[in-house]
């Protein structure tokens, strides 16, 4: 019983060690010099969930400046009916 618990503890330690490596996310708008525009709903859809919520920057990897601009442009696209406020389930 104790040997089995020891193995589980070791496996947990291995999982924690493997998690430390991650790739730094780079802001797509800074790297490629892309302008954010509300008239391009296909480009904006990449930054909203399937439920219609705006994805946070820790997931998308955008910088703070472009995340603010992105939120404004998504809201603008919703106002002129290029993007839905809520997606159907």
From Swiss-Prot:
HAMAP family: Ribosomal_bS18. The lineage of its organism: Bacteria, Pseudomonadati, Spirochaetota, Spirochaetia, Spirochaetales. It comes from the Bacteria. SUPFAM superfamilies: Ribosomal protein S18. It comes from Treponema denticola (strain ATCC 35405 / DSM 14222 / CIP 103919 / JCM 8153 / KCTC 15104). GO terms for molecular function: small ribosomal subunit rRNA binding; structural constituent of ribosome. Belongs to the bacterial ribosomal protein bS18 family. The keyword Methyltransferase does not apply. This is Small ribosomal subunit protein bS18.
